[in-house]
Amino acid sequence: MAQPTASAQKLVRPIRAVCRILQIPESDPSNLRP
């Protein structure tokens, strides 16, 4: 599990982009709730 799969990397990029746009910390799961 040390190396993320290609599909995981494809998901991480948009997720981090959204977090940056919404200005929410990625490490805080409570902020990811709708």
UniProtKB/Swiss-Prot annotation:
Changing E26K: In HYPT4; uncertain significance; increases HR protein expression; abolishes the inhibitory effect on HR translation. Keywords: Disease variant, Hypotrichosis, Translation regulation. Changing P25A: In HYPT4; uncertain significance; increases HR protein expression; abolishes the inhibitory effect on HR translation. One of its GO terms (biological process) is regulation of translation. Coiled coil: none annotated. May function as an inhibitory translational control element that can negatively regulate protein translation of HR gene. It is linked to Hypotrichosis 4: An autosomal dominant condition characterized by reduced amount of hair, alopecia, little or no eyebrows, eyelashes or body hair, and coarse, wiry, twisted hair in early childhood. This is Protein HRURF. It comes from Homo sapiens. The gene is HRURF.
